[in-house]
Amino acid sequence: FLKKLGLASVTLGFSPALSFANMADVKKIPQNIKDNLTSYKDVTSYNNFYEFGLQKSSPKANAHKMKIDPWAVEISGEIEKNKTYALEDLVKLASLEERIYRLRCVEGWSMVIPWVGFSLSVLLKKLTLSSRAKYVVFETLYRPNEMEGQKSRVLDWPYIEALRIDEAMHPLTLLCFGVYGKV
């Protein structure tokens, strides 16, 4: 039921036009990390967003073609009232935190990244969930004219992922707005 959110963390993390969060206000969560952080360069240039193409370098090369202003998140489904949040309002719903998590790709590679965001549960608690709600579904934006990878048939677009409600409400589940102190 969270629609058009799938690319928010990628595109926003690197857009000076949308730098509305004061990073001095970001709470750094103390963590015992044994591994080194993955470099900012690697985090921002080696990733899978097939919306922009099939190569690891495609998102960095093609994401600039996507219109990101204005950006809104549509929320609908098993909730009391459908809601649309402008990004600048969504990011203000809670104090931002920096959390260092290891991203593990199904392909077998991983990165240790300082993410910026807040617990997804904060947003979900602001919505009145129906007793029938079982999943939180994330659906990416579908604009093949801006996201050329969506013209391919490698996936059935738009891309959809989901979490069970208990997974989505877990305090470690992060709604991410940026990385490396950049929002």
Q: Where do the protein language model's features map onto the residues?
A:
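Structured, non-membrane catalytic/scaffold regions adjacent to prosthetic-group chemistry
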Residues: 22-183
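Generic low-polarity alpha-helical segments
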Residues: 1-2, 160
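N-terminal export signals
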Residues: 2-21
